[in-house]
């Protein structure tokens, strides 16, 4: 007896749009962050309707069933949506359960005015490279990968004496490379970076001729801090300031000596990195690095 193959008739075709997808990027490793994050989205006008992103096969964090956007997600074509569609505001919150990256929050407006993945909109010169993804920076609890240097310390506001939280730190090497980190609520920071290239590589011709071993190698680095807490924007329902406002803070003064000394403050601090050792940056005579927003009293 021959098997009877049932006939099927297409009754309905369902089409769904993904209105928010994000590629997270690790600038220290110059690689995508494909797992380990908890990414949530909450309507500003209804904080009880938080949804969590799912991870696609390619490591993109995406959202479905976004509150208030069902019509746009299921619209068959653009003509059925209307032009332009109304926008809604949401709080995007990112946390890393394993503690590799600093948690951040940002208000986003949906639907996006462009197709494709979310691009964080920061000022020109901001460290975030939107062409690669949404950059997250190393936390103080992250273990540096092999052959990576760690520039770390504790920031203190020279005016208030309180921890300088949510500052953006930049470490620049002589070859022009820049590496970034954020200070946490206690002012602690950690900037991870690969060791700068040696001028002549091992095994090359001619070989290194200065007689120094690898563990005797040093490099000059330049540290700068962007810190202007008065310019930070709050995020509704969050204890974190807006990520974009953190990245766009103004330049701060760094005090190599205690504030009030004849040396004063500088917008950059040049110091030396030693191979194989964390570089703990501090103001002379204390364990913290004193900074202040430019224009504030000290």
Where are these predicted regions, by residue range?
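Short, acidic Ser/Thr/Gly-rich low-complexity loop/linker segments typical of extracellular
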Residues: 36, 45-76, 175-198
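Short, ordered, surface-exposed loop/turn motifs in non-cytosolic proteins
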Residues: 29-46, 159-174
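Beta-strand-rich domain onsets/edges
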Residues: 1-33, 111-150, 154-163, 181, ...
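Exposed beta-strand and adjacent loop surfaces of beta-rich binding modules
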Residues: 19, 36-38, 89, 150, ...
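N-terminal accessory interaction module
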Residues: 54-55, 60-120
